[in-house]
């Protein structure tokens, strides 16, 4: 569930498309880096705050090998019992649960409008093609915990100086003290603002378009008292500037919304995986508890 080399969008919502097509499929979607059970410190320093660290060491699972063996035994040899065709999904805080599908069914949506429920704290609505953050929005602190699941969207009205432009959206979970961690991001070439593969055109400066952005899949638990921060730029970490760079002007209001799908913890089947017993895992747990 992190953008390392296997990206979340390679599996989400593909897992549901497979199921809907009658193809038997199972998912094991963790927050992991390459922290294998026999060397859980292998890439530990790379999994920093907001990049999987909060899910450590619950991300270190050795039972996936048993799952894989049972899968191949059944489907290649006809041996044993058919594996359960469900999705095991891990939140950014490390909690594992079972879902029939992912994105799951029966979620509730929260819509936060830019300039309203998402307050502009940067004092600008302009994104310059230099990679620097322009508009920055923050929500009010949540009164209750919020569990964001799967594919948040950012639908935003914009105008551009030319037929082009790009928007990078960074979504962060911020504590009452203002300490923030990355929970996800989205990026869009505005020539494809309607989505899909067909390039669109419009009248620069004079015409407003609605960019229908979708975030990489995320599963993020937000504590009560925390707030969300949405920062917009022309490009971001691990991305190149757009080949059609342009000044982008954000239009705030009811047509520009951050849309979050949420789940209720009490409705879900949570579980704890086999515990990592490597000394590195134990030392980390003792350190965080202390």
Map each language-model feature to its residues:
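Acidic beta-to-alpha connecting loop that harbors the catalytic carboxylate
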Residues: 1-3, 32, 235
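Conserved alpha/beta-hydrolase "acid-adjacent" motif
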Residues: 4-12
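C-terminal catalytic histidine-bearing segment of alpha/beta-hydrolase fold enzymes
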Residues: 24-106, 111
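Glycine/threonine-rich phosphate-binding loop and adjacent beta-strand/alpha-helix elements that clamp
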Residues: 64, 76-290
């Amino acid at each position: 569930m992190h953008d390392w080399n296997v990206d979340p969008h390679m599996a989400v919502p593909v897992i549901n498309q497979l199921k809907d097509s009658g193809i038997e499929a199972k998912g094991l979607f963790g927050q992991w880096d390459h922290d294998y059970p026999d060397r859980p410190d292998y890439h530990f320093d790379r999994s920093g705050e907001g990049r999987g660290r909060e899910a450590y060491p619950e991300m270190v699972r050795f039972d996936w090998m048993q799952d894989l063996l049972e899968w191949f035994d059944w489907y290649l040899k006809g041996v044993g019992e058919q594996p359960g065709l469900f999705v095991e999904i891990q939140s950014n805080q490390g909690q594992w649960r079972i879902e029939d599908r992912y994105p799951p069914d029966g979620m509730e949506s929260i819509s936060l409008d830019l300039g309203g429920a998402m307050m502009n704290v940067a004092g600008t609505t302009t994104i310059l093609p230099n990679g620097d953050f322009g508009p920055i929005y923050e929500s009010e602190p949540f009164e209750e915990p919020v569990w964001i699941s799967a594919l948040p969207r950012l639908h935003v009205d914009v105008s551009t100086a030319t037929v082009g432009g790009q928007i990078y959206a960074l979504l962060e979970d911020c504590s009452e003290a203002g300490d923030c961690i990355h929970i996800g991001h989205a990026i869009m070439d505005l020539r494809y603002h309607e989505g899909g593969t067909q390039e669109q055109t419009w009248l620069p400066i004079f015409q407003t378009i609605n960019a229908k952005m979708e975030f990489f899949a995320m599963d993020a638990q937000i504590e009560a008292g925390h707030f969300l921060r949405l920062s917009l730029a022309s490009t971001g970490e691990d991305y190149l500037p757009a080949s059609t760079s342009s000044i982008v002007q954000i239009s705030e209001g009811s047509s520009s919304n951050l849309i979050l799908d949420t789940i209720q913890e009490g409705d879900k089947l949570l579980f704890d995986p086999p515990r990592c017993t490597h000394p590195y895992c134990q030392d980390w747990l003792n350190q965080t508890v202390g």
